[in-house]
Every structure is written in structure tokens, then in C-alpha cells.
């Protein structure tokens, strides 16, 4: 097969984006990195977002870490997902930072979570630690939007979690709350505190939180589309 080339500007259509992603399928991260002059780190301990950055280069992504989607003109978000040898997700998937203040009037329809999950390009990548990072292969991409049932499930979880935040119960939220969507602390160190609402309506300082998709949600999603048993 002819060697793929990175997109030098953002893709103009979903078809172009998907076609480019399909070209990467089967290549190792080391091969893709070498083709664009990147050095593959030994592991992801200090470079947690490295795989995402590499694929953004190949796919012509535009957003960086800005709040809009990675492919803003198309309204598509890129999510890499580490999978085991059976194609099952190995970890939860970060969606966006959870807003802990200023939430009056926010609805599911206008929420950042729904905005980020409206249209997602999922790219599975081999993630088992026994495989050296440079030798991990990129899998077949999937362009996905939540169906009615998935949207309902995510909405219910989001509403439950946001109610707890608004009612000053952020410190009581655990990873077990929510069936498919969870909230967890998201901070590189325990000193990075942010404002939130306390139990009596007062301002408190707490760790920043992030919304994550649980593995049971992404596992069912991948299994349904790739017919994994």
C-alpha cells in the first residue's frame, strides 16, 4: 500500500476525515511518528496525550486544547481509545472538565458534555503495556453519534451528577455515581484547587473534576460497531 501522508490543513468533509483515519489503520505508532519526524517516547508516563497529538497531526486537527471540537468546522471530536487484544477499552475516556460553579440555567442540550459527544471519531489503539509504545498498532476508526438510547442514558447520568454539584455535594461524588458517565478529580497534583459550591451554599476549594465515559459504555459502543464478542 502507498505510504499515507498527513493532512496539512483541516479536513473539509467527514468523508475526507474518515478516509484519512482509515489509511492509518494497521500502522504502528512508531511508524506514524517517524513519518512526521516525531520521536516516540518510551512510555506515556510523562506524555499522556502523546498518541492524541500524533493522530491530530495526521488528521489535520485544528482545536488543540481549545473548548471547541478537534475538527471544529465539521463538529467532530477525536477520541483515541486504548484497547486490549480483544478490542475492549482498557480505561475510561475523558470528555471535558466539569463546571463546578455558574451552572444556573445549564441544560443537557446546551452542556459541554453533549457538545463534545455529539459527533466523535473513535480511533482504537493497542494499549496493553506488554507491547512497547512504538509497536502498538492503530485500529479501524469509527465515526459515531449517540443514538436515542445512548443520549438518554448520558443525559440521566449528567443530570444526576450536575444536581449533586449544584446542591453542594461535589465532595460526595464518587466514580460509582452515574451508570455510563462519571465525574472524577482531574489534576496533576493535589495543590491545583478550584472553586465549588459547598453543602451550605458557601464557596469552597476542591480538586478540579472531569467528566469521563465509563468502560461499560465505550465497550458496548465498540462491540456493537465492530461486532466484537
Curated annotation (Swiss-Prot):
Effect caused by changing residue 135 to K: In strain: ECOR 51, ECOR 52, ECOR 57, ECOR 59, ECOR 62 and ECOR 64
Lineage: superkingdom: Bacteria
UniProt subcellular location: Cytoplasm
Lipoprotein recorded as keyword: no
Pfam families found in the cross-reference section: MutH (PF02976)
Record GO biological process: DNA modification; mismatch repair; regulation of DNA recombination
Protein name: DNA mismatch repair protein MutH
InterPro entries to which the protein is assigned, alphabetical: DNA_mismatch_repair_MutH, DNA_rep_MutH/RE_typeII_Sau3AI, DNA_rep_MutH/T2_RE_sf, Restrct_endonuc-II-like
Family affiliation: Belongs to the MutH family.
Any one GO cellular component localisation term in the record: mismatch repair complex
Amino acid at each position: 500500500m502507498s505510504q499515507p501522508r498527513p493532512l496539512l490543513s483541516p479536513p473539509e468533509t467527514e468523508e475526507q476525515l474518515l478516509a484519512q483515519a482509515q489509511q492509518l489503520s494497521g500502522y504502528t505508532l512508531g511508524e506514524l511518528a517517524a513519518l512526521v519526524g516525531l520521536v516516540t517516547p518510551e512510555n506515556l508516563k510523562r506524555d499522556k496525550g502523546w498518541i492524541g497529538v500524533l493522530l491530530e497531526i495526521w488528521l489535520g486537527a485544528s482545536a488543540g486544547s481549545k473548548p471547541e471540537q478537534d475538527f471544529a468546522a465539521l463538529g467532530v471530536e477525536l477520541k483515541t481509545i486504548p484497547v486490549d487484544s480483544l478490542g475492549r477499552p482498557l480505561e475510561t475516556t475523558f470528555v471535558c472538565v466539569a463546571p463546578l460553579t455558574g451552572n444556573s440555567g445549564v441544560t443537557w442540550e446546551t452542556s459541554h458534555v453533549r457538545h463534545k459527544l455529539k459527533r466523535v471519531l473513535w480511533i482504537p489503539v493497542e494499549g496493553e503495556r506488554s507491547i512497547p509504545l512504538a509497536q502498538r498498532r492503530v485500529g479501524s476508526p469509527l465515526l459515531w453519534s449517540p443514538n436515542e438510547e445512548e443520549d438518554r442514558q448520558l443525559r440521566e447520568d449528567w443530570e444526576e451528577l450536575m444536581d449533586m454539584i449544584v446542591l453542594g455535594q461535589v465532595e460526595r461524588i464518587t466514580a460509582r455515581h452515574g451508570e455510563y458517565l462519571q465525574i472524577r478529580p482531574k489534576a496533576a497534583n493535589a495543590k491545583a484547587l478550584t472553586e465549588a459550591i459547598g453543602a451550605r451554599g458557601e464557596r469552597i476549594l476542591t480538586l478540579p473534576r472531569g467528566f469521563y465515559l465509563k468502560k461499560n459504555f465505550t465497550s458496548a459502543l465498540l462491540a456493537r460497531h465492530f461486532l466484537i464478542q
